[in-house]
């Protein structure tokens, strides 16, 4: 069996080769060991799953768009079967990482930063499920995402400074959840604006350059979303149903 160091090294190689399914396998093996993940290992795990889920989320959006434009075609059953296949892959990936988060990562985490990171991650993957589910399944995933994001926020607000990249990334994704899943633009804008304003107030206290760069990048994403969402609200008031904003989230 490969050593922990070898698994991490192979995950880095897989990342460079853009073989993210293999990167997931390596980091999953690391995560299932009893020792708490280091910051580097935690980030590698996140990048691996983010890429395997991200490509399929993008595929699902493309196929859903085609399905919406081709409602009377003879090929519609083929389109729907293909979309269903992608949804199965999305479900399996989300179930896989959520099991690891619940069974290994949260119980083994000893730092508040780690807990915020993993609860945020839990919220993210329940949100990804809610993106394509319907009826009761969507309601359950949305509720689970909300609970996880709220727990992450409770820990972050108590233990991380407003300029911390993980706290800002949480605010970014939590606000996207309010906007996209709960259809609550006011809550989304309020959360994003509060996070941005709180970070601005303490920006001068940052010293470490790499930390500052990450903070500024996420703050820009928050501001981009605020600009987009407020614009969408104005357009929706003028022409209901025509707003089609694309939101951004952290990497």
Curated annotation (Swiss-Prot):
Domain of life, per UniProt, equals Eukaryota
Q: Which SMART domains match?
A: 14_3_3
Q: Name one Pfam family in it.
A: 14-3-3
> Which InterPro entries does this UniProt record tie to the protein?
14-3-3 (IPR000308), 14-3-3_CS (IPR023409), 14-3-3_dom_sf (IPR036815), 14-3-3_domain (IPR023410)
Q: Which family does it belong to?
A: Belongs to the 14-3-3 family.
Q: Know the name of this protein?
A: 14-3-3-like protein
What is the source species? Fucus vesiculosus (Bladder wrack)
